[in-house]
Design a protein with these regions (language model features):
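Alpha-helical transmembrane segments of multi-pass small-molecule/ion transporters
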Residues: 1-325
Length: 325
């Protein structure tokens, strides 16, 4: 195993713990690490490119071949969860509209690229996951401003054109470039370049988490009952996304790999993108709901995968896989 492979394996195995550590460092030393925020857009563009090298335009055809699960995932991601976030914000924080804005922003952003890693670990349908991630990533420059405009309207003043442009730079263009390289090299780039970039993509995510956490420091230094309530709301919505994805899969009578993908894609969000947007376009209070999520998202996802494996269908699927070896 090469040094890069060892580093990648170490980061992948300990990512949940490392994320918590980087969040704590960012909160503890915000003055030292806050300058990183000036480079978050470039860092995010690199992370998107590196994580999108695993598929091309042909993989997107999976959406057309099995449209219903993908449509349901998108409905949960961009209709159900944003509406629930809006309702939670208005119900719990009627005097703090910026907290409501932060909750809605958190559930307007696309599904997380990290879901590719977790779906693979969870024995899910990786082809479907890749299609969802790529399509959602490409649509993000248009879906995010539209969701904020429809749900928040005049509550939020934002430069929509600038936001779309920055999302194109951070998300859409890097993803399209990666897909084009995959297509032109007939997939060779996934076996050669992607593994070499993988540890650097994970390190980039940790740096982004560190930068995002610096924005939480002012809040956590003066913790209040309202902030505790906000943290609980963020955690509850996070769990709800996973739960709705899994229950939707059960209603569709989907097989276990599809159920894993629907649950994880519905629950994992691209928090780094939300934090970059919150820092660039909104007051500080908007950042807190978004920036706090990385503290527990990865650890929660690890627990969700174990729960899925412990279900009756999960045990049967894993046992069948062991017998076929």
């Amino acid at each position: 195993m090469s040094p890069l492979e060892k580093l990648d394996a170490f980061l992948g195995k300990h990512m949940a713990v490392l994320i918590v550590a980087f969040v704590l460092v960012g909160i503890t030393f915000p003055d030292i690490f806050s300058p990183i925020n000036d480079y978050t857009m470039a860092l995010f563009a690199f992370m998107t490119f590196a994580n999108s090298l695993g598929g091309g335009f042909r993989e997107m055809a999976d959406v057309a071949r099995r449209p219903l699960p993908v449509v349901v995932i998108f409905a949960i991601l961009h209709v159900v969860m944003p509406l629930l976030a809006l309702a939670a914000g208005k119900l719990l924080f009627p005097e703090a509209p910026l907290f409501t804005t932060g909750l809605v922003l958190e559930y307007a952003i696309p599904t997380g690229v990290a879901s590719l890693l977790w779906v693979s670990i969870g024995r899910g349908n990786t082809s479907m996951c890749l299609s969802v991630v790529l399509l959602d990533t490409l649509l993000a420059p248009f879906v995010i401003p539209l969701t904020l405009r429809v749900l928040l309207g005049s509550v939020v003043e934002m430069d929509t054109a600038s936001m779309v442009g920055n999302l194109m730079i951070m998300v859409a263009i890097p993803a399209l470039l990666a897909m084009t390289l995959f297509q032109t090299t007939r997939g060779r780039v996934a076996a050669t370049v992607k593994p070499r970039l993988a540890p650097f993509a994970k390190l980039t995510m940790l740096v982004l988490v560190l930068a995002n956490a610096t924005g939480c420091a002012p809040f956590l230094r003066d913790i209040t009952p309202t902030l505790v309530k906000l943290i609980c709301a963020v955690f509850a919505l996070c769990l709800l996304g996973f739960f709705l994805g899994y229950q939707a899969a059960r209603l569709l009578k989907a097989d276990f790999p599809t159920a894993v993908t629907m649950s994880l894609n519905s629950g994992i969000r691209n928090i780094a993108a939300g934090s970059v947007l919150a820092i660039a376009y909104f007051p500080g209070d908007v950042l807190f709901p978004v920036a706090f999520s990385p503290l527990f998202l990865q650890a929660t996802t690890a627990v969700i995968v174990k729960i899925l494996h412990a279900t009756k269908t999960g045990k049967a699927f894993l046992q069948q896989g062991e017998l076929s070896k």
